[in-house]
A protein has these predicted regions:
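Positively charged, small/polar-rich N-terminal and surface patches that mediate targeting and assembly
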Residues: 1-135
Length: 135
C-alpha cells in the first residue's frame, strides 16, 4: 500500500501549462493520481479527505462546516504489489515529485468458519496482483 499526502488545492498541470491556467481550469491533483492508478492496473486507489489534523509541524487545521479546508492535508491511498507501486511512482514522477509518500507492506487476511462459532484466520503476503483478487 502506498499513501501519497497532498492538499486538496493542488492542481494537475498539463506539460507546458502555466500555474495560473491550472489554478482555474485544472482538475484536482488527487483526481489525476487516482485516474492514472486505474489506468496503471492498480487494485485500488482512494482519495481520503481529512477533517482535523496537522502536517510538517504546522498549525492544526479543521475542516470547515460549509465545505473543505484547502490547507488540510489529504491522502491518496493505492493498493497493489510493491513492484507495481514502484513502477507507478517512476512512471508518474511528474505528479508525485516532492510529495510525502509512505509505503506499507500488505498481508491479505481471509477469515473462514471451520465449525459453528469457530473462525480460522489465514494470512498471506501480497506480492502479485493475484494475491489481492477477491474470490
Amino acid at each position: 500500500m502506498l499513501r501519497v499526502y497532498l492538499t486538496p488545492k493542488e492542481r494537475f498541470r498539463q506539460a507546458g501549462g502555466s500555474r495560473l491556467k491550472a489554478a482555474f481550469s485544472g482538475r484536482p491533483l488527487y483526481q489525476e493520481i487516482v485516474n492514472r492508478a486505474k489506468r496503471a492496473g492498480l487494485v485500488n486507489a482512494v482519495a481520503h479527505h481529512t477533517h482535523y489534523g496537522f502536517s510538517n509541524h504546522g498549525h492544526v487545521q479543521v475542516r470547515e462546516v460549509e465545505g473543505m479546508n484547502s490547507e488540510l492535508t489529504m491522502c491518496v491511498e493505492m493498493i497493489g504489489p510493491k513492484a507495481t507501486l514502484e513502477d507507478f511512482c517512476r512512471a508518474h514522477g511528474d505528479l508525485l515529485t516532492d510529495k510525502v509518500m509512505v509505503y506499507k507492506h500488505l498481508e491479505r487476511w481471509k477469515l473462514g468458519m471451520t465449525a459453528p462459532g469457530r473462525a480460522e484466520l489465514t494470512e498471506a503476503d501480497v506480492s502479485t496482483i493475484e494475491d489481492l483478487d477477491s474470490e
